[in-house]
């Protein structure tokens, strides 16, 4: 699929409207996303940002764009230093450790590695050179080894966030310092303090301010002017506002064409944040839920909308994905006896009219939602569910069909599976594991949540079989209901009883 044939509309925070994506260089996209400050395990608010922009990255690639994706690590920061001092640990060792832990989480969530993942500590020369340019342009000033940016020299300051300069007050996300010319001025360089990491600079030893880091790295890996800049909604002010001011001051031809911001994850109607001590780490959630279920949950609302975290929502995502993979596994098993026939046919047989229609609707609905500002909410419902229902209904009919009719149906099912897999792949919900392996992993997570092992379930199944033989149906129902409350459904197939995950009949609203 050629990118030019489909118009992707993205909501641009700067203009507050959806705009058609028109790259600076045809066929190529430069994308910069602000990464984490690495001092602790990442929470699912961080996961929301990562998954949101991973979906964008994947979809741009799906549209055949050549994407240069940069996501940084802040490994030099006050929070890192404070945590390292409490731990009695070197700040860079601490941040390196949590950068690595973050990458483990990203792998679990199926987030593709960006083209570049720079760390602040590795780009001091770029940062210092940019600060020098800002001072040369009379937009920065030095005070006792510190360097501040003069916001009065930035005529468009506040345009992105809607924060008027005269309304900006010290103490409101703005550091209080009487040496500043304007309370809203912010640090480009901080003079060294005892027992803190520092680097040599023209203004003496010190370390960079937070905002200059992203300006320097985006210019270094992309250019002063690039296509898309992303991050969490909380970064609009002051971080992104300050980035714009710095880059414009240092570079004549600069700017970002599209500013994208993902919504917060909330818990009990409050933004999830480490500072509020109300966060759930990615590692904590994936200990009892499959990472794909967490990813599905994070895509269950349009990326700009707030997302309310509840256990019941995670259970819903887990159940929805299990159904998808169980259907695809059933399809694999159903097609297995006909592989030789499909090979011999060699594509001679045509798809059924209904099969073609199913695929067309699936693809059309998927593309229309994604092209409309990456609207992943309910993306695996509608036409996608119709495709799954068609698979399930068709598998039971295969043996009864005449050869020619059966071959057309087999070809249709193969093509429907390809279309279903493509959607999963673009959404990052497809792994290198087989369907059976993913289902096995999801069942294991169900057992962890239910606090019961395979042996415990087997024992309860045997007790239920005995109860049914004795016509003790009250006992039989009690066992079934007990397991259903834990998210385990029993199914009687012939003389055999098997289990699969289900939505718990009494799911808690939070975890």
From Swiss-Prot:
GO molecular function: ATP binding; cysteine-tRNA ligase activity; metal ion binding
Reaction(s) the record says it catalyses: tRNA(Cys) + L-cysteine + ATP = L-cysteinyl-tRNA(Cys) + AMP + diphosphate
Presence of keyword Repeat: yes
GO biological process: cysteinyl-tRNA aminoacylation
Cofactors named for this entry: Zn(2+)
'KMSKS' region (motif): residue ranges: 271-275
Annotated Pfam families: CysS_C, tRNA-synt_1e
Motif ('HIGH' region): 36-46
Main enzyme class: ligase
Annotated Gene Ontology cellular component terms: cytosol
UniProt KW keywords: Aminoacyl-tRNA synthetase, ATP-binding, Cytoplasm, Ligase, Metal-binding, Nucleotide-binding, Protein biosynthesis, Repeat, TPR repeat, Zinc
Positions of ATP binding: 274
Repeat region (TPR), residues: 315-348, 368-401
NCBIfam families: cysS (TIGR00435)
The protein, known as: Cysteine--tRNA ligase 2, cytoplasmic
Organism expressing this protein natively: Arabidopsis thaliana (Mouse-ear cress)
Lineage: Eukaryota, Viridiplantae, Streptophyta, Embryophyta, Tracheophyta
């Amino acid at each position: 699929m050629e990118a030019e044939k489909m118009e992707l509309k993205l909501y641009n925070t700067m203009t507050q409207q959806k705009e058609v994506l028109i790259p600076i260089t045809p066929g190529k996209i430069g994308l910069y996303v602000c990464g984490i400050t690495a001092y602790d395990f990442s929470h699912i608010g961080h996961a929301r940002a990562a998954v949101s922009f991973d979906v964008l990255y994947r979809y741009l690639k799906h549209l055949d764009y050549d994407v240069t994706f940069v996501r940084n690590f802040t490994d030099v920061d006050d929070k890192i230093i404070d945590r390292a001092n409490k731990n009695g640990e070197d700040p860079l060792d601490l941040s390196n450790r949590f950068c690595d832990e973050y990458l483990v989480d990203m792998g679990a969530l199926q987030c593709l590695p960006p083209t570049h993942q720079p760390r602040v500590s590795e780009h001091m020369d770029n940062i210092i050179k940019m600060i020098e340019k800002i001072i040369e342009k009379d937009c920065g000033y030095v005070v006792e080894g510190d360097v501040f940016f003069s916001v009065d020299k930035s005529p468009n300051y506040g345009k992105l966030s809607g924060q008027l300069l005269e309304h900006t007050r010290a103490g409101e996300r703005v550091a209080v310092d009487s040496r500043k010319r304007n309370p809203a001025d912010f640090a480009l360089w901080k003079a060294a303090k005892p027992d803190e990491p520092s680097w040599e600079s023209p203004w003496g030893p010190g370390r960079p301010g937070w905002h200059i880091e992203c300006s320097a790295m985006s210019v270094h890996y992309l250019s002063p002017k690039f296509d898309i800049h992303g991050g969490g909604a909380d970064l609009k002010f002051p971080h992104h506002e300050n980035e714009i001011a710095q880059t414009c001051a240092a570079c004549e031809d600069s700017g970002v064409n599209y500013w994208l911001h993902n919504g917060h994850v909330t818990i009990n109607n409050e933004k999830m944040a480490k500072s509020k001590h109300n966060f759930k780490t990615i590692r904590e959630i994936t200990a009892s839920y499959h990472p794909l279920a967490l990813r599905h949950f994070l895509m269950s609302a349009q990326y700009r909308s707030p997302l309310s975290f509840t256990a019941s929502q995670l259970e819903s995502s887990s159940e929805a994905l299990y159904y998808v993979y169980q259907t695809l596994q059933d399809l694999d098993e159903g097609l297995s006896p006909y592989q030789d026939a499909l090979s011999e046919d060699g594509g001679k047989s045509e798809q059924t009219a209904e099969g073609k229609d199913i695929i067309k609707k699936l693809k059309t609905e998927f593309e229309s939602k994604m092209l409309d500002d990456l609207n992943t909410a309910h993306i695996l419902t509608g036409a996608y569910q119709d495709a799954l229902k068609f698979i399930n209904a068709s598998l039971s009919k295969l043996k009864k069909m005449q050869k020619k009719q059966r071959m057309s149906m087999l070809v249709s099912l193969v093509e429907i599976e390809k279309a279903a897999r493509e959607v999963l792949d673009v959404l990052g919900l497809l792994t290198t594991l087989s369907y059976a392996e993913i289902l096995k992993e999801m069942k294991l997570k169900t057992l962890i949540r239910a606090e019961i092992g395979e042996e415990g379930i087997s024992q309860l199944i045997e007790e239920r079989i005995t109860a049914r033989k004795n016509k003790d149906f009250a006992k039989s129902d009690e066992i079934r209901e007990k397991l259903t409350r834990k998210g385990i459904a029993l199914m009687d197939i012939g003389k055999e009883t098997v289990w699969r995950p289900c939505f718990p009949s009494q799911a808690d609203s939070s975890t």
